[in-house]
């Protein structure tokens, strides 16, 4: 009988960054949201996130790595959702 590996805890997350003229978002998946955010802010994350102080706008726990990657794909295409999160960020920082 084949043994299954235990499901890995996975999260999908949305980061935000804003200044007076621009608002940016970044969507990704990870096993540890806090550690991943620290990597992004230390300049060791994805190239597109380097040089900015990112804020966690949204995170969602997923049942598996595969599900997290699927949710990431969908969130990257849901611009209205990310725009709403960024508007909330701009309101908080104003």
What are these model-predicted stretches?
Residues 1-55, 59-81, 87-94:
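GIY-YIG nuclease catalytic motif and its immediate N-terminal context
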